[in-house]
Amino acid sequence: ASLPGMKWNAQWMQNPTAEEGSIIKRDWWQPWEYDSLPNVQYIMQSYDTAFSRKETADYSAISTWGVFRPTDDSPDCIILLDCQRGRWDFPELKEIAHREYSYWETDMVLIEAKASGTPLTQELRRMGIPVVNYSPTRGHDKTTRMHSVAPVFEAGMVYAPQRMFAEEMIEECASFPFGKNDDLCDTMTQAIMRFREGGFLNLATDYDDDSMGVRQRIYY
């Protein structure tokens, strides 16, 4: 099931968001209008971790992204394959992480290098899961990160299926920085920054000098 962003927000969240203040505009997301997902070249899962089931606790959030080409002559783009969040204790989160990794056959699991991410990193690595601890550039607060990934959206390189989980991600991003939650936003910015640093997503503005080559992809 799917609903347009504003309608979904008003009906299910009772919190319609003004588009004017958004860093990431709703219409910058490209709709994937097919029932089946595209064939993807590379899959990354991005985590924002918090270990508590208390109602007042932060959420843990997971988003899964795939690199693909919408057409044969288009540049590499990414598509949101899935996202979810919840208040899970550590054993629950570990189980969910293993299940999601196995289901999507993920190439990389990305966990921010902060205190709450360390135990999950250690446990998943013991299971043989390829975890990378990600440390955003110093001084990059959440708002700066959102601005840094906005050009990728504006260039039409980010797709989402017409599903309720995608609407939740789109709405949270459109609500930032004034929305109630930003856990999914954190997983999104982390993933796109890593894709950019790894050479998976290249913008025309990256190459002011024509002599510059395309960055080599980094698969770890």
Which residue stretches match the model-derived regions?
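An active-site-proximal beta-strand-loop segment
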Residues: 47-60
